[in-house]
Amino acid sequence: MRHTTASVLSAVALAATLAACGTTDDPADDDEAPESSAEPITLTDARGEEITLEGPAVNVAGTEWNVIEYLISLGVQPVGVSDIEGFEKWNNSVELSPEATDIGTRGEPSLDTLATLDLDAVFVTDQLVEGAVEQIEENTPVIVVPGGDAEDPIGQMWDNLDLVAQATGTEDRAAGLREQFDEAVADGRSALAEAGAEGSTVAFSDAYQAGETITIRPFGEGSLIGGVLAELGFVNAWGTVEGLEFDPVYGLGATDVEGLAQLPDDSAFWYIGGAGETDPFAETLSDNSLWTSLPFSADAVRLPDSIWMFGGPASMIQFVDAAVETAS
C-alpha cells in the first residue's frame, strides 16, 4: 500500500500472533476497556499543546492506523476509524470491533461523522489537510501523535504508545506491551544466532505500480522496520547504496529496478504487500531481464500479508516472527 511520505492487540489478538518467538504470555489478560475515572488527565501532545480530559478517554476515534493499533492493543476499541476497509486489509495484528464507524480517509476525515460520535478525544497525526485539526477541536479534544521519526523510530513508537496510554488510562497495558516486544526481540535474536543468520544483510521494501511504472520503496535504517531489523542484528542493505535518500519521518526512500543493481550481491531481498494486492515482484517483473538477472531475485521472499510496517508493537512482533522464520 502506498503510504505517502510527504504528508507514511486486544490482548487476545496479540497472544495469537506470538507463537514463533515464544512470547504468548500477555500480562493484560482483561479485554475490557479501562473504567471511567472522575480524575482529570492533563497531557502534552506532539504540537506542544496541553490538553485536559475529564477522565480516561473511552469513546475515541483515530485518523491514522498506527493509533488504531495502539488503542486496540491497549484494550480500547475506537468507535471511529479512518478507512476501515484499508485498515483491515493492511493490519491484522489486532481485531477491530465490527461496530466501529468509518470516518473517511486518513488525510481528510469527515467532520460531520466525527460530530455524531460523542467522542472523548480524537487521535490524529500531523498529516491531516490544513485546518482539519482546528475544525475538529471546535467540538472534541484533539491529541496529535507524530507519524514517526527516522532519527529514533522505535523510540518514537514507544512515545506514541505512551501518549495514547496516558490519555486512555492504560499505562499498565503499555508497559506489558513493551515487555512482550523486548522478549520477542531477545528470543528472535537468539534464534537467528542459533541458525547462523545473525548479521545477515537484508534489503526490505514494498512497491507500487502506476501504469507501466513500478516504484520500489526501500525501508532505510530510520524506518520502523529498519529499526527492528537492527535490533535483530541484521545489516540494512539499503544503507550501502550511494545517493539513496530517505525521508525524515518514516525513513523511506524511492528507487526503481535499475536501482536494485546497487545492492550487495549477498543481500536477502524481502518485501511485503497487502491481501489481494498485485505483487509487482512476482507478477509484473517476472519476465523483466534486469530483475531476473539480480543475484537475489530468485530467492526474494514476500513476507506474510498485512503486517503493518508503520504500526505498533503488535505489528512489530509479527514482523520479528516473520523475519526469524524467513532467515532461519
Segments and roles (model prediction):
Residues R47-G48, I103-L111, L244-D256:
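Short helix-initiation/N-cap motifs at beta->coil->alpha
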Residues L18-S37:
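Bacterial lipoprotein signal-peptidase II cleavage site
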Residues G259-S328:
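Structured C-terminal subdomain patch of bacterial secreted/periplasmic proteins
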Residues M1-A19:
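Sec-dependent bacterial lipoprotein signal peptides
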